[in-house]
Amino acid sequence: MPDTKFHFSPRPNRAHEIQWREWSDDAFREAQESGKPVLLSLSAVWCHWCHVMDETSYSDEGVIGFINQHFIPIRVDNDQRPDVNARYNMGGWPTTAFLTPEGEILAGATYVPPDQMKELLPKVNVHYQSNRNEVTNKALELRQRRLTAMSGERGELSPRIFDDILRSVVENYDPVFGGFGEAPKFPHTDAIDLLLYAYRRNRDPDLLHMARKTLDFMSRGDVFDQEWGGFFRYATRRDWSEPHYEKMLEDNAKLLPNLLALARITNHQSPLSRASGDEPGVRDFADRTFDYVEWKLRDKEKGFFYGSQDADEEFYKLSKEGRERAEEPYIDRTCYVSWNAMMISAYLEASWTLDRPELRDAGQRALEFLWDECRDAQRGMYRFHDGSGPQVLGLLGDQAHTAKALLDAHEVTGESMYLERARELARFIVERFADRENGARTGGRSAGFYDVWDQVEDVGRLKDRQKSIQDNTVCAEVFLRLHHLTREDKSREIARATLEAFVSGYPHMGYFAAGYARQVDTLLNPPAEVNIVGSAALAAELHRAALALDVPSRVVQVLDPARDAARLEALSLPAEPAPAAYACFGTMCSAPVTQPEALAETVRQMQQAAVRPAAAT
């Protein structure tokens, strides 16, 4: 029987006959004691070519026998161990990597057909067995070179960073089909978000057009499931056709905020002006995506979201009626914490953007599952929950995205409990993930946060902690928002130091650093800060007006005088009049605003005085 610790292709295969080990100290110790190299397979439950490799190369009797005799085979699920994937991925999935017993890379590829695999396996084995000392010494040399390359210098933040990255987004925009680059076409949601952010900064219609056209071609094209709703992972052609049909919770969670932001900017009209009459608009595509997630990817009993639905080209080409008669693609019912946190944030944003309060309730319920079932009180958030319990501690992304979702919940619901939980996670991030050598732990000039905590696994490349610009960008957002919510200067300094750590590296990333650009600009140009004083019931209209402000960025919270007296005092806000909103940009604050319709104009006037123009395109 197949080992249930591993997921193999749902179609007939013999991959389970390979004596797979989990990623562990024991597996590498076995390799060292036996003198055998390691075969590392990085796979994913949704990955079509991973399934093909299970059915072909890993089902070949000769391949199975040779691997079991001459290698220590280790199988890792990409979604469960993104830290391993970040260090060993060879350019896609499946990844087929050959390692020394110390965990350094000998050779690697992605999908390897059976005939090539039969040639490759003995070549790698002979090379390693014949050159062990040379291979080991070279591995040590490569590790030292890698560590030197990772120790980049910090730099000063300046408006040029935002301008450089926005220019890269614009230069890589595809004017024919939208999106960025040619083929394959990925959504690049951070780049779309930066276009919409920059448009709200300077009202350049070209920036809005690029975002609208990208989302329009995606929503009306093959990369959107026109029958069920929801987006496939990417398209293999420039015109968004011939998609890879896996549906990922993560990808849909990232695309939904793009659609919601565009819906607000265009007042829920169609992404492009060419649509008219009964053609669906941006709200329709957002609604249909949420409906798909509710239908197929949410656990109705426990409240969390599933990880993905498998790719099956023939199934997704069927009509609704045809799909009802066919076997449905596999759904990975694992709860991945960071992806759940992303979708929770999207649900909370949609609850007021689309006026769907049931999405707020569902988002809060999922957030409670993460906090209650996927967290250790002393050791932070786990990576995933597979039904048997939470698994894998110590990854930065899960802490950062959960903290962000908690701040989103605080902003949308007004409940201070979420703010306190976010502060708790933020303290844990500083304590366990900060680059201590550069002072992040004490709030000094730091080099950001590592992707894994300080309880490092002494296995392979996991011995060397890395810094992800994406995860650090989320951390910077969390600390910057905490600063505006609490007026604690230390949080702002941590955010600044985190962003400074990537000043020397961002030029090499181009538009892939779009999320970083937004947070740099938000730090240099203060967001609209709106504190609403009054009970949730009395302040509801002011709260809604604050959430809907048409500004590049804003921080909103509701403070109930009966519950939040200490915080009102810390923020130097009076308990009366109530309800009333106080809008601030930096040190400039408004008089109390008591009429919801007056809040937008008050903020607009203050914004004009506070924010510099974005770079022209």
What function would you assign to each model-found segment?
Residues 1-34:
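N-terminal leader/targeting and pre-domain segments
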